[in-house]
């Protein structure tokens, strides 16, 4: 029986990547040393780091005036790093699209930043994206948004018009799964553990003219320092960068982001089409704002939801339990999830519904 992992993160990885890791783990590139034990100062790792950055630049068409930095601490650490580095006047705007946007606001406030909510969909239970209040104050240091809301199941493809105010994007859950123009943003960050690799790595893409505005920052949060040190200020997450590098090469071999985006839209359409015609399952998200990465759905009865999850597990469909804040079910359809996995889920849900009419 095939196993399909619908976890929201850490999440499914491409099988060829796992196979390659398994083969190379005892001796990386015939060095006699595992990737788990090589020095981060070695030529072996220098090549891994260089390749990962270049492959990411190729896939996303990252302009030369943007730095690519490799951090630890998850996307959550960037909720603090972004205002420390990019908000010299301690004033930012934020689009409140759900849990992770609110977490970003809370962390910014902890470091003395005033956060102005420019739009919120809280009144709609975050089942749609917020409408931006215009005009936007041009004295704001930046505007924070979340491109994909993992818990609520919404995704932003149309960006707000912000004038000269830079956009800062938390792309953690649709990074490399939906195409964006990097030059539309001042800063992009993303935890790797959804679409890029195992947990332990965070990607930061930041425009050169925005760093160095604030002096005497904590070293581990200083974008300018990390840029100057090529992300090697301290020991980086060697294995996580190596694994992410393999995923990037896999993405290129698949045809890049255009191919992956088409696949992701096809997978999401398959599941949404079933949910929309179902008499048992519902998805609460406004159709135009639906995520291609994270699809929440419910039966409306907690005991029936539990039965769905248990039965799915018995059919090799794992980690469908919804986030603890919203309950129900959630299917995460990241890049490495094959169409066959989504078809298996739809077939199971259809059979479950037929049995429980």
Curated annotation (Swiss-Prot):
An annotated Gene Ontology molecular function: pyridoxal phosphate binding
EC number: 2.6.1.52
Residues modified as N6-(pyridoxal phosphate)lysine: 194
Chain sites annotated for binding pyridoxal 5'-phosphate: 75-76, 100, 150, 170, 193, 234-235
One annotated Gene Ontology cellular component of this protein: cytoplasm
Compartments where found: Cytoplasm
Chief location bin: cytoplasm
Chain sites annotated for binding L-glutamate: 41
Pfam families: Aminotran_5
GO BP annotations listed: L-serine biosynthetic process; pyridoxine biosynthetic process
Co-factor(s): pyridoxal 5'-phosphate
Superkingdom assignment: Bacteria
Keyword field: Amino-acid biosynthesis, Aminotransferase, Cytoplasm, Pyridoxal phosphate, Pyridoxine biosynthesis, Serine biosynthesis, Transferase
Pathway(s) per entry: Amino-acid biosynthesis; L-serine biosynthesis; L-serine from 3-phospho-D-glycerate: step 2/3
Known catalytic reactions: O-phospho-L-serine + 2-oxoglutarate = 3-phosphooxypyruvate + L-glutamate; 4-(phosphooxy)-L-threonine + 2-oxoglutarate = (R)-3-hydroxy-2-oxo-4-phosphooxybutanoate + L-glutamate
Record's cofactor remark: Binds 1 pyridoxal phosphate per subunit.
Record's keyword annotation contains rRNA-binding: no
PANTHER family linked: PHOSPHOSERINE AMINOTRANSFERASE
Matches recorded under HAMAP family: SerC_aminotrans_5 (MF_00160)
NCBIfam families: PRK05355.1, serC_1
Subunit structure: Homodimer.
Chain's role: Catalyzes the reversible conversion of 3-phosphohydroxypyruvate to phosphoserine and of 3-hydroxy-2-oxo-4-phosphonooxybutanoate to phosphohydroxythreonine.
Family designation: Belongs to the class-V pyridoxal-phosphate-dependent aminotransferase family. SerC subfamily.
Protein name: Phosphoserine aminotransferase
Biological source species: Lactiplantibacillus plantarum (strain ATCC BAA-793 / NCIMB 8826 / WCFS1)
Taxonomic placement: Bacteria, Bacillati, Bacillota, Bacilli, Lactobacillales
């Amino acid at each position: 029986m095939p196993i399909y992992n619908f976890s929201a993160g850490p999440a499914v990885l491409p099988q060829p990547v796992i196979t390659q890791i398994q083969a190379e783990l005892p001796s990386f590139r015939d060095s006699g040393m595992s990737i788990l034990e090589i020095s981060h100062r070695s030529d072996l790792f220098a090549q891994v780091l260089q390749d990962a950055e270049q492959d990411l630049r190729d896939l996303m068409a990252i302009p030369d005036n943007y730095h690519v930095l490799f951090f630890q601490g998850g996307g959550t650490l960037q909720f603090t790093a972004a205002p420390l580095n990019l908000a010299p006047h301690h004033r930012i705007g934020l689009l409140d699209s759900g849990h992770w946007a609110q977490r970003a606001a809370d962390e910014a406030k902890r470091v003395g930043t005033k956060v102005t909510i420019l739009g919120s969909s809280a009144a709609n239970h975050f089942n749609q994206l917020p409408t931006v209040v215009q005009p936007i104050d041009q004295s704001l240091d930046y505007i924070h948004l979340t491109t994909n809301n993992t818990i609520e199941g919404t995704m932003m493809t149309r960006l707000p018009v912000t004038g000269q105010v830079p956009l800062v994007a938390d792309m953690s859950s649709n990074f490399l799964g939906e195409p964006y123009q990097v030059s539309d943003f001042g800063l992009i960050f993303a935890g790797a553990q959804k679409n890029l690799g195992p947990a332990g790595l965070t990607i930061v893409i930041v425009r050169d003219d925005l760093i160095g505005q604030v002096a005497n920052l904590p070293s581990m949060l200083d974008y300018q320092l990390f840029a100057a040190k090529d992300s090697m200020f301290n020991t980086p997450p060697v294995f996580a960068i190596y694994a992410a590098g393999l995923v990037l090469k896999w993405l290129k071999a698949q045809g890049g982001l255009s191919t992956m985006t088409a696949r992701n839209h096809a997978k999401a359409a398959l599941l949404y089409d079933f949910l929309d015609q179902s008499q048992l399952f519902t998805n609460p998200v406004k159709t135009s704002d639906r995520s291609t990465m994270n699809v929440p759905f419910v039966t409306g009865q907690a005991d029936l939801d539990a039965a769905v999850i248990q039965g799915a597990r018995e059919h090799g469909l794992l980690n469908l339990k919804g986030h603890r804040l919203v309950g129900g079910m959630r299917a995460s359809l990241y890049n490495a999830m094959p169409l066959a996995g989504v078809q298996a889920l739809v077939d199971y849900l259809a059979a479950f519904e037929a049995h429980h009419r």
